[in-house]
């Protein structure tokens, strides 16, 4: 029986005694030992030891050779063999993937790593430290934690195991809705400080900033505060009462007016401080927190004041140049009878939101009725687009805050279509195989959290961010079961998938092809529904943002299948179900095209439109918002808001494959411009932190959704 040797990279090869003999002879030559018969004898002894086994590790063989040589007459030969083995190990390590990736970081030559995340400034030490940890975490996960077929599928580009630099090496999850209300009203401990309920809005926002930083350092995805205007409203009341008490003490004639005026100023200043805090702090992950504020449904004067303060601060901008703030992402809820139409009590806040969106791109909007229809209840997305389903506690109450997403595995749909070579039957068969593999990968995320104790992340599990107050040695896995947490299957490239399968006509122009695209997503939804039924975990379908993935999958597929027209020829894949960015349509038709997908992929979605400068035509933007209200749950506005600090130009910079340039004076100095683009669901500043090549090309090709002159 010939045993198999398990090599360092995990592959198996047949055992060959000749290789042992050759290695010993090389060591003998280096040691000045001229005894070929002895070398052959040692090789035969080792072979006889190994032949009794079906599988042996390469390190076991080398150790056996060393032991045999050490017991023989030529100690210098044993020493030479050990030194030879050590030198080979060093050379192998230098050539190894781990060493190459570390060198690429240290020497700043690995552009794929350095530009993978547009929110990470890879030039600074804290981020480099995080990237280094990520390289090691990825390597360990691939070598020791994940099933080999999952690793191979990820390496090939069949699937993408998101955030390998954090999970499964660390028992971390993706994104969440912080239970801010519970933390602020019940108090909590952070570090060495016991935090009591705040007594003013300024203190409440200061504490909120610290909570955001702590939570964001313990998870790897987005951090969302759901309905922040309603959560923080009681602290506006507390400030008002303090100011009114001051007015009474000083016998100010109009105590109510004085208190209201001082409260308005305090609230504005509090949210200004919060915005600056978010944009200046760095988490332990080496980046600004991916944080989202959901607001707009509060009806009290305190909630309205918070809504206005958030929007007015965003409009004002950051610093002396009034730069557009990238974070927090703002998501404004619109509800008929509240703020949707003229005459609604909060319609004035909607007008302020329109102005803000035209100048700062945010807020995106949540259309209340559609969100409830598609996801079962109203809530703000976790991060940029991940939505929770309905979950009720033991009292039958719907709970959103404190819940989370455990992670994502995305399918490379265009690759399946390329492998199928135009055969639809083969495509469906391959898709089912990939779905089984994706499920296996997702289950590793769940398994990694089993047995984990609350003490690994006190802010999440012991101090209330996850809506629970566990003890240090309590298991955390229970709070993720029965649909309380979601875990998501992602997908990319419906547009390229249809092109690869059917070619010819554009997806947008064919009702038949549109139906084919929808059918693919329907099959994905059927799969996650089945997994949810079988496991009890909250499997959901997620329309992957694809900041890095649009480039990675396309690059791997180009290497495998070549440049395929309509598929790999652009250098990127289209995000999830989105319309091809080069297709010229009006915003209403784009909404109609994308509207069938969110109800299917209700675990994660967003629709958006590209517009010219509409700061002086807010009615046109409102028309699109109002149209979206009846058709899609979640809508974003992309408008040109770039600024040149050399010549004063405001508008849209020219986007090239190498960067962004002022069209008026040619300035492209990153320190003298402000360039803002929607990366996926979040905004980014590509002038300061460049996109990867695929995302840069996609941004360059985007067209405005104008129609027949209705917009602009």
Regions found by a protein language model. Give the residues of each.
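Conformational switch/transducer regions in large eukaryotic molecular machines and scaffolds
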Residues: 16, 656, 681-682
């Amino acid at each position: 029986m010939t045993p198999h040797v398990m090599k360092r990279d995990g592959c198996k090869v047949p055992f060959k005694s000749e290789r042992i003999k050759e290695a010993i002879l090389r060591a003998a030559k280096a040691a000045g030992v001229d005894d070929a018969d002895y070398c052959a004898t040692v090789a035969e002894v080792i072979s006889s030891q190994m032949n009794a086994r079906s599988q042996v590790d390469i390190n076991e063989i080398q150790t056996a050779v060393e032991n045999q040589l050490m017991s023989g007459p030529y100690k210098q030969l044993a020493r030479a063999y050990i030194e030879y083995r050590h030198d080979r190990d060093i050379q192998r390590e230098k050539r190894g993937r781990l060493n190459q990736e570390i060198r690429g970081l240290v020497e700043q030559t690995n552009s794929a790593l350095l530009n993978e995340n547009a929110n990470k400034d890879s030039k600074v030490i804290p981020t480099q430290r995080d990237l280094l940890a990520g390289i090691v975490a990825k390597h360990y996960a691939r070598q020791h934690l994940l099933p080999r077929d999952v690793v191979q599928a990820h390496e090939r580009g069949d699937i993408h195991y998101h955030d390998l630099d954090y999970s499964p090496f660390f028992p971390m999850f993706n994104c969440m809705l912080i239970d801010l209300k519970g933390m602020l009203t019940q108090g909590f401990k952070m570090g060495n400080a016991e935090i009591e309920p705040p007594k003013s809005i300024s203190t409440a926002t200061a504490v909120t900033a610290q909570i955001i930083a702590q939570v964001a350092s313990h998870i790897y995805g987005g951090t969302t505060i759901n309905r922040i205007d309603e959560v923080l409203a009681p602290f506006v009341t507390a400030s008002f009462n303090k100011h009114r008490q001051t007015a009474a003490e000083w016998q100010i004639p109009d105590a109510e007016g004085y208190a209201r005026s001082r409260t308005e100023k305090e609230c504005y200043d509090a949210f200004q401080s919060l915005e600056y805090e978010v944009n200046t702090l760095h988490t332990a992950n080496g980046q600004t927190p991916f944080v989202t504020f959901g607001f707009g449904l509060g009806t009290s004067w305190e909630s309205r004041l918070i809504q206005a303060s958030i929007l007015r601060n965003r409009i004002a901008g950051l610093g002396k140049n009034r730069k557009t703030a990238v974070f927090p992402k703002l998501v404004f809820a619109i509800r008929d009878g509240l703020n949707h139409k003229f005459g609604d009590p909060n319609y004035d806040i909607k007008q302020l939101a329109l102005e803000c969106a035209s100048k700062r791109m945010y807020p995106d909007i949540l259309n209340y009725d559609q969100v409830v229809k598609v996801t079962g209840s109203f809530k703000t997305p976790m991060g940029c687009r991940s939505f929770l389903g309905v979950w009720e506690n033991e009292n039958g109450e719907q709970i959103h805050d404190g819940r989370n997403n455990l992670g994502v595995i995305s399918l490379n749909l265009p690759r399946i279509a390329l492998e199928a070579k135009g055969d639809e039957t083969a495509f469906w068969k391959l898709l089912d195989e990939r779905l089984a593999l994706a499920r296996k990968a997702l289950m590793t995320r769940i398994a990694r959290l089993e047995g984990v104790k609350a003490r690994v992340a006190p802010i999440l599990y012991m101090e209330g961010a996850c809506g629970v107050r566990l003890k240090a040695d309590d298991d955390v896995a229970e709070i993720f079961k029965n649909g309380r947490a979601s875990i998501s299957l992602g997908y990319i490239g419906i547009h390229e998938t249809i092109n690869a399968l059917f070619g010819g006509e554009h997806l947008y122009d064919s009702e038949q092809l549109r139906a084919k695209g929808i059918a693919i997503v329907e099959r994905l939804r059927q799969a996650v529904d089945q997994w949810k039924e079988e496991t009890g975990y909250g499997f959901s379908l997620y329309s992957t943002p694809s900041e890095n993935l649009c480039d990675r999958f396309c690059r791997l597929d180009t290497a495998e299948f070549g440049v395929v027209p309509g598929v790999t020829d652009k250098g990127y894949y289209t995000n999830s179900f989105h319309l091809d960015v080069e297709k010229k349509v009006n915003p209403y038709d784009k909404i109609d095209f994308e509207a069938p997908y969110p109800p299917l992929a209700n675990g994660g979605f967003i629709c958006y439109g590209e517009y010219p400068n509409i700061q002086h035509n807010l009615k046109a933007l409102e028309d699109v918002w109002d149209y979206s209200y009846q058709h899609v749950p979640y809508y974003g506005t992309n408008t040109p808001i770039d600024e040149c600090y050399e010549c004063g130009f405001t508008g849209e910079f020219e986007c090239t494959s190498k960067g962004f340039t002022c069209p008026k004076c040619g300035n492209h100095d990153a320190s003298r411009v402000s360039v803002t683009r929607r990366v996926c669901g979040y905004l980014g500043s590509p002038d300061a932190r460049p996109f990867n090549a695929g995302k840069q090309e996609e941004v360059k090709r985007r067209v405005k959704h104008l129609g027949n002159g209705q917009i602009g």
